A protein has these predicted regions:
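Bacterial N-terminal signal peptides
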Residues: 11-21
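Extracytoplasmic
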Residues: 469-626
Length: 626
C-alpha cells in the first residue's frame, strides 16, 4: 500500500525528536509509574546518587591562578562587539562564534588559557575507570530514573534490555561518546539495537556494530518513517537494505571508513524518507546520472539537484500522478528551496553519506559529511542556520570536527560530565559562558580542531540557494571513449545498433555529457543546462534502402517530452520520450525512410527541455518490427 501521503504528515514530528547531544535536550515529562516502576525508579535514583558522589571525589586539583585566568578570558567573550553581514539579501548580526572575527581572535586567547589548565589534569583525563563511571552518570542523568523505570516496568523483556545496558560499561561509554539516545529514550534505543543484532550477525562487530548502535540511538520514537510499523522493525529493514547495498557495491566507498567515534553514522539513515524513495533515488543516480556518483565529495550525489531540480516558484503539483512520491514529483518541474534540499538529502542518504537538514530563516537547505568535514549545501554557512539536528549549528560543526579524535573527544566529555555532576551550567553562546569544567570540555574540543589542523570547509553551492545560475565557471571534463563503444553493428536480421558514442564528435558541452555507465559501457546525458540546443550527428551505412523502425534506449525522470530527428537534411521526425522512472526503456518505434549507403541522422531536443540519458539507437527493417 502506498504510504507517501501519510508519511509526509509525520515529517515534522519526526524531526522534533532528532537531537543527539545529551546536553541540549530539555527535561522530559514525568511518567506515571506502577508500584514496581516506583521501586525501579528508587533503584535507578540511588545508582545515580552513588555515581554523582563518586564523581565529585574525582575532581582533580587545579592551579587557582590558571583557573582564574581561564575564567577571566572566556568571560570577556560576552563583551565582544557583534558584526553585521548580508546573508541571502538579509542583514544578520553575528556576535558569538567564528563568524565574528573579533570573537574568533579573542577565543584564541581563551583556548591558550584552557590549555594551561588541561596540562595540569592530564592524569585525570586519561582514566578509563573514571570514564566508565562518568559515562554511566551521564546516561542516568540524561535518561532520568523516572523514564528508565517507565520503560523497564513494561515487562521482563524491557527490564532485561535496561539491565543489559546498565551492566555493560563498554557499551555505556560507546553510547555516550556517540551522543546518547535521542530524547533520552534509551529503552527504545536498546530495543532497536537488539533487534538489529538479532537480524544480522555482522552487526556485532567492527563498523557494522558502530553503525547499528548509532542508528538506534538517533531514531528513538515509537515508529520510524513508516507510521504503522514499530521503530525497531523499520530500523531492521533499513539496516538490512543498506547492508545489501553495501555488499552489492552500491553504497559510497567511504561508507565503511567514516571513522571517528562513530557519531557520523547516526546520520546515514534518512530522517523521513521511505525505502521505496531511497531505492528509487539510487536508481536515478546509477542509471540516469552515474557521473554524479563519481564527483568530488562536496557535490557527489547531491549534484542531481543542480542538474535536474531547477529553482522554480509556484509549482502546482495537484495534477501530477497520484502514484508518484513527493521526491518523484520534484523531478517533474523542480521547486523552491525545500524540495531541492529534500532531493539533495536523500541523494546522500541513499548512498550512505551522513546528511542533515540545515534550515536558516526563510530558507531550506542541507548539510552533509565529506572526508574533509561537514559542509552546508545550497544555503548559507552554519553560522547562519537555525539548527542542525536540534543543536546550535556551530556547535554541531564543532562536534563533528572533535569527534574525529576519539581519544581527545572522550577527554572533553569527562570534563563535561564532571561539571554536570558538580551542578554546573552548560556552556552557552559558543563557549562564552557556563560552568568551569563544562566550559573546559568545550575548549578541549577546540583544542582537538587546532591540534588536528581540522579546517572548516565552508559552503557548497551557496550562490545556487535560490538561483539556477552559478557565478562560478564550471569546468567541463572530457572523457576518453574507447573505440569499442563507437562501433556500429548489424545483426543477422538486419537490425543496426548505433552506440550513442558513435556520433561525429563525442565531446562534452553544456548540455551534452558523455559518461561511463554503471555497468561499464557508455551513455550520454542531454541535460537542462545551456541556452541553445546541441546536436549529436550520426553517419550510418544502410545496406538496403527501405523503411526502418527507429528506437532509442533511454532513461528519464520526467514526462511529456519529445526529441527531434533530422534525417538526411530533409526529413524532421518527432520521437515521444517515455517516462521511465529511471529505468532503461526503448522508445516506441518511429518510421524512417532511409536510402542505401550513407545516411545522416541528427539528434537534438526542443527548448526548453528536460534531461534524458541514452545508451544506443536501433534501426530495424520494418518487416521485423512486431
Amino acid at each position: 500500500m502506498k504510504k507517501h501521503d501519510t508519511i509526509k504528515s509525520v515529517w515534522i514530528m519526526t524531526i522534533l525528536t532528532l537531537s543527539t547531544s545529551v546536553f541540549t535536550m530539555g527535561r522530559p515529562a514525568e511518567i506515571d509509574l506502577t508500584p514496581e516502576g516506583k521501586k525501579l525508579q528508587a533503584h535507578y535514583s540511588k545508582m545515580l546518587a552513588d555515581l554523582k558522589e563518586a564523581i565529585t571525589r574525582l575532581e582533580p586539583k587545579v592551579n587557582e591562578k590558571k583557573k582564574a585566568e581561564f575564567t577571566k578570558q572566556f568571560g570577556a567573550l560576552e563583551n565582544v562587539t557583534p558584526v553585521t553581514e548580508i546573508v541571502m539579501g538579509n542583514e544578520r548580526t553575528v556576535k558569538y562564534g567564528p563568524g565574528n572575527p573579533a570573537f574568533a581572535k579573542k577565543q584564541v586567547e581563551v583556548l591558550t588559557a584552557a590549555r594551561a589548565v588541561m596540562k595540569d589534569i592530564e592524569a585525570f583525563l586519561i582514566g578509563d575507570k573514571e570514564q566508565a563511571t562518568m559515562a554511566k552518570f551521564a546516561l542516568l542523568t540524561h535518561a532520568t530514573p523516572n523514564r528508565l523505570a517507565g520503560f523497564a516496568q513494561k515487562g521482563e523483556e524491557e527490564k532485561a534490555l535496561m539491565d543489559t545496558l546498565l551492566n555493560d560499561d563498554k557499551l555505556i561509554v560507546q553510547t555516550m561518546t556517540m551522543g546518547g539516545a535521542g530524547g533520552g529514550r534509551y529503552g527504545q534505543a536498546m530495543r532497536s539495537y537488539t533487534a538489529i543484532r538479532k537480524a544480522s550477525e555482522r552487526s556485532h562487530e567492527g563498523f557494522f556494530q558502530v553503525w547499528a548502535l548509532a542508528a538506534s540511538l538517533q531514531y528513538t520514537s515509537d515508529t520510524y518513517v513508516y507510521p504503522d510499523v514499530p521503530a525497531a522493525d523499520s530500523l531492521v529493514r533499513y539496516y538490512l537494505n543498506y547492508l545489501k547495498a553495501y555488499d552489492d557495491g552500491i553504497l559510497d566507498p567511504a561508507f565503511s571508513k567514516i571513522g571517528g567515534t562513530g557519531w557520523n553514522y547516526r546520520f546515514v539513515f534518512p530522517d523521513s524518507y521511505t525505502l521505496e524513495d531511497v531505492e528509487w533515488i539510487r536508481k536515478v543516480l546509477r542509471n540516469y546520472r552515474p557521473d554524479h556518483t563519481r564527483l568530488e565529495y562536496r557535490w557527489r550525489y547531491c549534484r542531481i539537484v543542480r542538474s535536474d531540480i531547477p529553482y522554480v516558484m509556484g509549482v502546482d503539483r495537484s495534477g501530477m500522478p497520484a502514484d508518484l512520491s513527493s521526491i518523484q514529483k520534484f523531478f517533474l518541474k523542480g521547486g523552491i528551496c525545500g524540495p531541492r534540499a529534500f532531493v539533495g538529502q536523500i541523494s546522500g542518504y541513499a548512498f550512505g553519506i551522513p546528511s542533515r537538514r540545515a534550515p536558516s530563516p526563510g530558507h531550506g537547505a542541507m548539510a552533509h559529511w565529506t572526508p574533509d568535514g561537514w559542509t552546508t549545501v545550497l544555503g548559507p554557512h552554519f553560522y547562519f542556520c537555525k539548527h542542525i539536528n536540534g543543536m546550535p549549528p556551530m556547535e554541531f560543526l564543532l562536534e563533528s570536527q572533535a569527534q574525529q579524535d576519539p581519544k581527545g573527544f572522550k577527554q572533553a566529555l569527562m570534563c563535561e560530565w564532571l561539571g554536570q555532576a558538580l551542578g554546573e551550567e552548560a556552556p552557552r553562546n559558543y563557549g562564552s559562558s557556563g560552568g568551569f569544567w563544562r566550559s573546559l570540555g568545550f575548549y578541549r574540543r577546540q583544542a582537538i580542531v587546532e591540534d588536528q589542523k581540522i579546517k572548516d570547509i565552508g559552503t557548497t553551492g551557496e550562490e545556487l540557494a535560490e538561483s539556477n545560475v552559478s557565478s562560478k565557471k564550471e569546468e567541463i571534463e572530457q572523457v576518453e571513449i574507447p573505440e569499442k563503444f563507437r562501433e556500429i553493428t548489424v545483426a543477422k536480421d538486419g537490425t543496426i545498433t548505433i552506440p550513442v558514442a558513435a556520433c561525429r564528435l563525442p565531446k562534452n558541452g553544456e548540455k551534452i555529457r558523455f559518461m561511463k555507465s554503471i555497468d561499464g559501457g557508455m551513455q550520454v546525458h542531454y541535460g537542462l543546462k545551456g541556452r541553445r540546443p546541441e546536436l549529436l550527428s550520426y553517419t550510418v551505412e544502410i545496406p538496403k534502402a527501405g523503411n526502418y523502425g527507429f528506437t532509442a534506449h533511454v532513461c528519464t525522470v520526467t514526462m511529456d517530452r519529445k526529441f527531434l530527428l533530422r534525417v538526411n537534411r530533409r526529413t524532421l521526425v518527432d520521437v515521444d520520450i517515455p517516462y521511465t522512472k529511471a529505468d532503461w526503456m526503448d522508445t516506441e518505434p518511429v518510421e524512417l525512410e532511409l536510402k542505401e549507403g550513407r545516411n545522416r541522422i541528427l539528434f537534438t531536443q526542443y527548448a526548453p527541455n528536460k534531461g534524458i540519458s541514452i545508451k544506443e539507437f536501433k534501426l530495424k527493417p520494418m518487416g521485423e518490427i512486431q
